[in-house]
């Protein structure tokens, strides 16, 4: 029997795959558990439409990430902090503080976990920080730390 897998089934198939499986296995397990649906013409058309919609959504998501990347790379985030001798900061600048400043001054809301910082910023001056907007899109934000 030809079935369309609705969920991943270990050793049999992944979600969205169309495979031939034994009739008994399909009727008694896959269909009853809701793991698969019988592959009819209408269900195949529905699956194709769903796949096209997912591809379109993924392409739109990448496009939005690229637009945001262009915006982020044009701006400089100004962060003020107290510093001591030699430009060393009292404390450090974390991704959370950068996100807060971006929210207030540029009205751009990002998740702090998207910032790829090896370590917090501990000195005055300019620093480039990578932001992972999408698995395929990474932007670089210029952060300027100045004295308060």
From Swiss-Prot:
SUPFAM superfamilies: L9 N-domain-like, Ribosomal protein L9 C-domain
Pfam families: Ribosomal_L9_C, Ribosomal_L9_N
MF GO annotations: rRNA binding; structural constituent of ribosome
InterPro entries in the cross-refs: Ribosomal_bL9 (IPR000244), Ribosomal_bL9/RNase_H1_N (IPR009027), Ribosomal_bL9_bac/chp (IPR020594), Ribosomal_bL9_C (IPR020069), Ribosomal_bL9_C_sf (IPR036791), Ribosomal_bL9_N (IPR020070), Ribosomal_bL9_N_sf (IPR036935)
A single Gene Ontology CC term: ribonucleoprotein complex
One GO term (biological process): translation
Record carries keyword RNA-binding: yes
Gene3D superfamilies hit by this protein: Ribosomal protein L9, C-terminal domain, Ribosomal protein L9, N-terminal domain
Keyword rRNA-binding: yes
S-S bonds: none
Keywords: Ribonucleoprotein, Ribosomal protein, RNA-binding, rRNA-binding
Domain of life assignment: Bacteria
UniProt similarity note: Belongs to the bacterial ribosomal protein bL9 family.
Role according to the record: Binds to the 23S rRNA.
Protein name (database record): Large ribosomal subunit protein bL9
């Amino acid at each position: 029997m030809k079935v369309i897998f609705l969920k991943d089934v270990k050793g049999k198939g992944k979600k969205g795959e169309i495979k031939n499986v034994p009739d008994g296995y399909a009727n008694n397990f896959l269909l009853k558990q809701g793991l698969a649906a019988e592959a009819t013409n209408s269900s195949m058309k529905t699956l194709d439409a769903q796949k096209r919609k997912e591809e379109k959504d993924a392409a739109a998501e990448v496009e939005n990430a690229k637009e945001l990347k262009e915006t982020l790379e044009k701006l400089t985030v100004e962060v003020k902090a107290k510093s001591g001798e030699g430009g060393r900061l009292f404390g450090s600048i974390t991704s959370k503080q950068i996100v807060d400043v971006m929210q207030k001054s540029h009205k751009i809301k990002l998740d702090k976990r998207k910032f790829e910082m090896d370590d917090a910023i501990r000195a005055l001056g300019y620093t480039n920080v990578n932001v992972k907007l999408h698995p395929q899109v990474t932007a670089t934000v210029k952060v300027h730390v100045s004295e308060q």
